[in-house]
Amino acid sequence: MPDSKPWQGPWKAHRLRLKAHRGPLFYASLQWELFAWLRRHEGEIDAIWCNDLDTLAPAVWHGKLPVVYDSHEYFTEAAGLTGRPLRRAVWLTLERWAMRRLSCMITVNESIAAAYRNKYGRDVAVVRNMPRRQPRVCVKGREAFLDHGVPTDLPIALMQGAYMDRDRGAAQAVAALPEMKGVRLVLVGAGVEWDEASARLDDLEMEGRLHCISKLPFDQLRRLTASADVGLSLDQAGHGNYEMSLPNKLFDFMHAGLPMVVTARKEVAAIVREHELGEVIEEASPVAVRNAVMKVLSMPKSDWQASLNAASEQFHWGVDEPHIERILEQSLKAHLADNQTK
């Protein structure tokens, strides 16, 4: 993609150059390039790990290697397919065709796993997308926000998201800001609702308390998160994917020691309530958001740290990482056994 950053991961990576960057042509280009790459390198590959439904067809069509389907969301119930029956039917057809040909499937939480088990009658493992356990970021005052031009004279409510699509809650957070007197709202990320918020920075009703920061490297985002006063996760109902989602920002807030206000989506609300990490609201009306934010801010941030620290010890990558090796081993064995019976 044109805005892709240079790869800095610990393993070798190959980037595909696509002829289209959006719409149906993007997906068609992606499928072709993936399939062509697999054909060129098939002698070098032992197994294929597919992230989400839009990478699955070339791997399954290739047909010669074990395929692990890693579904990061309930793809066919995503917001982008709501109200688009033809597009959704295409993806559902692909999903049904591929499911019978997988070696293994994993997803990010038990709710989505249960939905797939009920739908296709197959085993689905759960590997949650949680951060590694590491020392908490040490921040000096609010310098991280000052570095991005955000004054630190008021408490800061933070919402972050790589892509703030419709109904991810950014619009609701902005609508609530006039009600949240004495609070600054910072949106970090990109997307449709981030763009709309950016266009309202000078609105009189925002009183100069709305701030938008473009997507940041993870280390910089961690510093901002640790420096904020309350985190917001306001996914809306109406899409099966959002209803069952377990967004990364929940764990980012947790590991940064940041109390949070969340909407009552199933997985998120259960964790926040059980571990006393903040406030859960049934709907993200301006008044409900304001009341919850003010309730969290009425307690010193230090008072939340015991429950946040305890949750961080329970929810981290070290808990689920061992499942990866087990899943790959099972997939390879199943593939070999299947080939021997043919």
Spans of model-derived segments:
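Acidic donor-binding loop of glycosyltransferase active sites
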Residues: S103, R209, T225-E243, L258
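Conserved donor-binding/catalytic core segment of Leloir-type glycosyltransferases
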Residues: V150-R168, A173-L177
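Donor nucleotide-sugar binding/catalytic pocket of nucleotide-sugar-dependent glycosyltransferases
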Residues: T76, R88, L92-R142, L146-D147, ...
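A charged, aromatic-enriched C-terminal amphipathic alpha-helix characteristic of glycosyltransferases
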Residues: A284, S298-Q330
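Membrane-proximal helix-turn-helix segments that form the acceptor-binding/catalytic region
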Residues: W32-E42, A57, W61, Y69, ...
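Nucleotide-activated donor-binding/catalytic signature segment of Leloir-type glycosyltransferases, i.e.
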Residues: E196-L224, V230
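Conserved acidic donor-binding segment of nucleotide-sugar-dependent glycosyltransferases
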Residues: E274-H275, E279-P286, M294-K301
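N-terminal strand-loop element at the rim of the active site
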Residues: M1-F26, S111-R117, V126, G191-V192, ...
